[in-house]
């Protein structure tokens, strides 16, 4: 993808993708695969397209002086199997609305099937009515995506698995566990203990421990405010004189992570590795992690990470091969579950 002018300047136009036709795609009931990348996911979208051996679908995106978004397809998608890749980073609501306009545009051009690929699904913490007079934004977002015209969805490592039930359309709730755990396993870290950041993540942390053949420790913590603030209380398990792999699904402001790391250090842990799927890294999260003395930070590109937030000890694994293979299998009508059993 090549952006001619910055997408944040009202009154400007950018060209997305390439117009040459795809070749070599497997046939399906929905025609050929077309990958359309939102502006926020240009790098990931290009990687997925390259994995599939196809150019990105071409469209023109204009932001008018009143900040209205206008999208025009530069090629016909009639009857085709279209995959809209959109990362939900800042500006979040602009990116959500861009995705919705894209879906509507594809629907009105008679696309055969419209698949939304949202590597990081926003509002995942708003999955239940746990306080008086609050909404359930995750359910609302699922309803909007369906109503606009999406036929299928894909996402990675949902914060709450029950969000799958908010969608009435078929979808694939994927995991980056195999990608990240395979990377860690190849490192052959000696004297390793896997540690969960909290009780809620303990089940997934156990999967890590079983795959790596290590002991499991769990940090018990108590929330002191909203989800961006927490306090680590105690350690379940022994990490003294052990290398520790701290596992979580996402890092927002880094508060929970810093508390967990400090507790591990106070309990006598040696080198600490920190692995998580979604690197949101809001506010000063990067500075907090940089000051913690971590051996290595391992994450993925489900959430675009700018260069100024990529620390020297940070390894970013691409989810493009995972998403690309799932897209191929969905297009060909093959099992996605088999991918994780191979």
Q: What does each model-identified segment do?
A:
Residues 1-342:
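PRPP-associated nucleotide enzymes
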